[in-house]
Amino acid sequence: MGLEKSLILFSLLVLVLGWVQPSLGRKPSVQDFKRQHMDPDSPPNSRPTYCNQMMKRRGMTKGSCKRVNTFVHESWATVKAICSQRQMTCKTSSRNNCHKSSSPLHITDCRLKGSSKYPNCDYTTTNSQKHIIIACEGNPLVPVHYDASV
């Protein structure tokens, strides 16, 4: 009887760990979005080293150089509010969960220079004000993917 109870408890433990374990160590997509694209505390600036520093600081040059990335210099509330705009088809995929900002936002585009190779990732820094298109998911909707600038 004791062995039977132990086997049942062990089976339940394995089952519970099977459900819980995949979510351990995996960041929610909204956290990835914030890490990769949000920089509300820095105004856009023309420092040519901005992208090199930020891409490294935010972990986008580990193992390889991320080719393109955009930082948004607006509050999280402003960016999150874009999710309440009209839904549209994304520019970079056929998904239909994208939303376009109603006004231009301050952004910095970082593009890997053609001659740059890992581990010496070297980026061009371009500041502008553009509408952004983001993918939103969840309930309530939150940004999970930066799709495009227009």
Curated annotation (Swiss-Prot):
It is an enzyme of class 4 (lyase). The active site is at 37 (proton acceptor), 145 (proton donor). Residues 1-25 form the signal peptide. Endonuclease that catalyzes the cleavage of RNA on the 3' side of pyrimidine nucleotides. Acts on single-stranded and double-stranded RNA. It comes from Rattus exulans (Polynesian rat). GO terms for cellular component: extracellular region. This is Ribonuclease pancreatic delta-type. GO terms for molecular function: lyase activity; nucleic acid binding; ribonuclease A activity. Substrate binds at residues 35, 66-70, 91, 111. Gene3D superfamilies: Ribonuclease A-like domain (3.10.130.10). PANTHER family: RIBONUCLEASE (PTHR11437), RIBONUCLEASE PANCREATIC (PTHR11437:SF24). Its EC number is 4.6.1.18. It comes from the Eukaryota. CDD domains: RNase_A_canonical. GO terms for biological process: defense response to Gram-positive bacterium.
